[in-house]
Amino acid sequence: MVKRGRFALCLAVLLGACSFSSIPNGTYRATYQDFDENGWKDFLEVTFDGGKMVQVVYDYQHKEGRFKSQDADYHRVMYASSGIGPEKAFRELADALLEKGNPEMVDVVTGATVSSQSFRRLGRALLQSARRGEKEAIISR
């Protein structure tokens, strides 16, 4: 039984890694249609080249234009309450997606649960739209 489980896991990983071959080279983006109640809108950008993910960027942009990963005040508040800042949390999520190739396999970052869940949701939307050849996915909250 354990061998079957390992085989299924290996097969899923291999199939997941190969599934990007149908996605044309380029950068794809997923974001929300509206800003949240605090004026932030998160986005995910993934660049594919040769059937592989080569770059992942995840962040939030405020309606005034600033980015959460670079907002010192937000960093101070988030770090004080959760022990991690947005720049580190977002980098961990992006690196995990590059490594695993599947947003569903990206673990929740401790202290950034809401962002982790949103990251997965944006990741699913981005991959679905990219497979249809669409460069941008805009989803509702």
Swiss-Prot record:
Q: Where is the lipid attached (N-palmitoyl cysteine)?
A: 18
Predominant location of this chain?
Answer: membrane
Enumerate the UniProt keywords alphabetically. Answer: Cell membrane, Lipoprotein, Membrane, Palmitate, Signal
Compartments where found: Cell membrane
Q: Which segments of the protein form a coiled coil according to its record?
A: none
Annotated GO CC locations: plasma membrane
Positions of transmembrane segments: none
User: What is this protein identified as?
Assistant: 15 kDa lipoprotein
Q: Tell me the organism.
A: Treponema pallidum (strain Nichols)
